[in-house]
Amino acid sequence: PFTADADTIVVNIGDMLQRLTNHVYPSTTHRVVNPPGEAARKPRYSTPFFLHPNPDFLIETLPGCISADNPNRYPTPITSHDYLLERLREIKLV
């Protein structure tokens, strides 16, 4: 569970950005659970924004995210289209 302070913006990182950053920014599993009791009556605003690169965009690990302590987990680049298909197959949507 995650508890945010007032006036906080929460950004959920997706799988593609995780790959691009070599897990420097890990992907999150997004789940919303209503708080119990009176806290459920407080306002909560959510604005989803999804960004997907052009199908031919080559996903290569960002050089600044590779180090001796964090070697490149993805030495072979992949297009965003192929990556999306790979992920959809993994979760059995294709």
Language model feature labels by segment:
Residues 1-94:
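C-terminal flanking tails of non-heme Fe-dependent oxygenases
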